[in-house]
Structure formats: C-alpha cells, structure tokens
Amino acid sequence: MLDARNICGSKILFNELQKNFRADIVKYGDKLLRNKLDERNKRVIEVGYDYFKNEPNLKESEGSLRDINLIFWGINIFKMLNANDFKTSSDLLSIKEKKTLRSSLEFLLLLRCHLHYLSERANDKLSFDFQISISRLIYKIPKKITVKNQNFYVEKMIKNYFSSIRDTKNLTEIFT
C-alpha cells in the first residue's frame, strides 16, 4: 500500500483508498516504522551480521533487497506524515544517495532475476553453483575462457555485490 499505483479500475475508489490509508499512516505510521525496524533487526540477527559471505542471500542479508524496501517504505511513511512540508520530504536523500540506492537496487535485482531463471525456482541464495553462470550472463563472457579469467569475472560480480550491499547498509543506518 505504501507504493500503490492505480493501474486500472476506478480512480475514485483508488483515491478513496489512498485517502483512508494516509489517515491510518498519520495515526499509526510511527508504530509501523518502528515495527519494520524491529523486523529488520531480528532478520539481521537471524541471517547474521557478517554480510561478506561467500554465498550471500540477496533478499535477506544486511544491505540487501529487504533493506532497500525498508528505505523506500520509510521515505513514503515520512512523506505521508509530513505531507504539508514538501521541501523536507523531497530532501530525505541527496541526489547522490538516490543514485547509489537505484544502482544497488538494479544490480541486486539483476542478480536475483538471473538466479531465479537459472535455478528455475524462487531462490535468493547466490551459491557457488550459480556464480559462474550469472557472471557470464552479466558480463557477456565468451564460452571459451580460462579458469583464471572466469574467476576474475566472478570476483568482479561479487565485488559489485559487496559494494552494493555496503552502500545500502550505510543508507539503511540513516533510518535505524
């Protein structure tokens, strides 16, 4: 509901839904955000604080897709709570932070889409079994390549992953 869009159907009903939802956010937004932050902290403890894992979870690890969602939700809740103060709500993230967040989101989604496609199921663990295949797809590596060069591309992909989650983790800490 925080990022709802009217794709089809009655605009009047959609606007009424949005109005009622905003009223609920005004009443309970602080509590909702605190609950989301508590969920995040529990998830990070369950998954582990060490986000430099060899086989990371693209969705649940610290700095991953869940944290990006938390940032977006936090911004949307803040905007709803401060609807009359557009300057404040539009300045929550700098242009550089927005660009960094978008870049992280796009890279993590790219990894996750390739992972789902190659594993032929919902899968969020970037295991060794898929790292070579995904790096080949991302960097368009020719089939015939030395193991050393192949490892270079896997390392490049993982380095980009770590950079993305580090950036997201740093932005998430603004909200926690």
Put a short name on every predicted segment:
Residues 1-176:
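A nucleotide- and high-energy phosphate-metabolite-utilizing enzyme signature
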